[in-house]
């Protein structure tokens, strides 16, 4: 027999159970703290590469020596469009919404107002997840693939800082040198990227191989020297703190957030980890990367004129007929770009 609702029995709706995953934004909120909405379609970044030249010694009677400028390059990016929307039809407003009492007496207009808030939250969550995915892609691969209906391109930041271990040098191999790798890589970041790395974010398999490594276990068990501490604990925003190494000085983290990939193979969508299983990311905890938003341009319904808005989010609603329906859409142009260099690595 079907589980029918008896409208004559006293009932109480305790709550609406929404089985939706939380929105995790660790990479976006931690590393891309320099948020800048632009008023233009494209975002240009001038890159000035410094060096470690020192001022020359000169004789007092000879005068100074010119320290020549290094010059700069300009990178130009066109932020991709993210434009999710939802549709509300008249028949949806005539029936009870999730969480509404059977005899609430809500009018269609009141339901429309409540549904608008719920729709915006859904659209905003989807856009936020895309921003987090873009932030991770930029740091891990140095590229952001823009794949969707009518678009297939790649934003390439020109990274030359990816390292791939091969054969028995891989973590878990017979010639693996995990602690030596981390020391060499932090030195490489300091030399080539002018950044002091203090964090290592490990993928799932990289984390397993790190803790299973005999040299790591031996170092952690050395009671005569404080070479580090393993003290795993959960942190907000889906992050797990694993412990600390003293040489090289690194805090170790894992980030288990996943995303739903329905564009690589639309016939077989899959849930994938944001951080590749074998990845090791070395990064500064305060890089101040930029989140640069392009301008949002649309036709204003009342005036019929084109309007450009300098914002990270544009929420708009408009009406269509035959059948009558209200469209609610969110528009954003969210790329990510850099103010200086850091070197993630892949093991």
Predicted regions and their residues:
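N-terminal alpha-helical "arm" segments
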Residues: 1-43, 341
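Assembly/oligomerization interface modules of large self-assembling protein complexes
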Residues: 33-102
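Long, contiguous amphipathic alpha-helices that act as assembly "spine/axial" helices in icosahedral shell
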Residues: 82-160, 177, 181, 187-206, ...
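Short N-terminal edge-element motif at the start of the domain
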Residues: 165-183
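Extended oligomerization regions of viral-like shell subunits
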Residues: 194-294
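C-terminal structured domain segments
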Residues: 275-334
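Conserved small/polar residues in nucleotide/adenosyl-binding loops
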Residues: 339-345
């Amino acid at each position: 027999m079907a589980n029918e609702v008896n409208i004559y029995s006293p009932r109480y709706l305790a709550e609406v159970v929404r089985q939706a995953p939380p929105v995790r934004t660790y990479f976006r909120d931690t590393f891309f703290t320099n948020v800048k909405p632009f008023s233009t379609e494209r975002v240009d970044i001038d890159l000035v590469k410094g060096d470690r030249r020192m001022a020359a010694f000169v004789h007092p009677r000879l005068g100074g020596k010119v320290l020549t400028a290094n010059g700069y390059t300009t990178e130009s990016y066109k932020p991709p469009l993210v434009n999710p929307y939802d549709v509300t039809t008249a028949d949806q407003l005539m029936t009870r919404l999730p969480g509404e009492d059977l005899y609430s007496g809500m009018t269609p207009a009141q339901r429309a107002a409540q549904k608008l808030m719920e729709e915006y939250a859904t659209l905003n969550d989807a856009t936020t997840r895309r921003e987090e995915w873009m932030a991770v892609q930029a740091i891990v691969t140095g590229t952001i693939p823009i794949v969707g209906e009518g678009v297939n391109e790649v934003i390439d930041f020109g990274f030359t800082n990816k390292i791939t271990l091969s054969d028995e040098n891989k973590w878990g191999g017979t010639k693996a040198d995990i602690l030596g790798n981390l020391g060499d890589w932090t030195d490489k970041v300091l030399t080539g990227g002018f950044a002091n790395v203090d964090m290592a974010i490990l993928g799932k398999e990289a984390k397993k191989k790190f803790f299973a490594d005999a040299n790591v276990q031996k170092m952690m068990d050395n009671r005569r020297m404080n070479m580090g501490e393993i003290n795993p604990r959960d942190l907000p925003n889906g992050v797990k703190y694993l412990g600390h190494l003293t040489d090289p000085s690194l805090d170790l983290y894992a980030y288990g957030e996943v995303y739903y990939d329905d564009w690589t193979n639309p016939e077989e969508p899959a849930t994938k980890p944001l951080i590749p299983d074998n990845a090791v990311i070395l990064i500064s905890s305060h890089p101040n990367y930029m989140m640069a938003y392009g301008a949002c341009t649309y036709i204003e319904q009342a005036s019929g004129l084109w309007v450009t808005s300098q914002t990270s989010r544009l929420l708009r609603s408009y009406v269509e007929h035959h059948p009558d329906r209200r469209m609610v859409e969110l528009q954003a142009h969210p790329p990510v770009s850099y103010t200086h260099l850091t070197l993630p690595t892949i093991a």
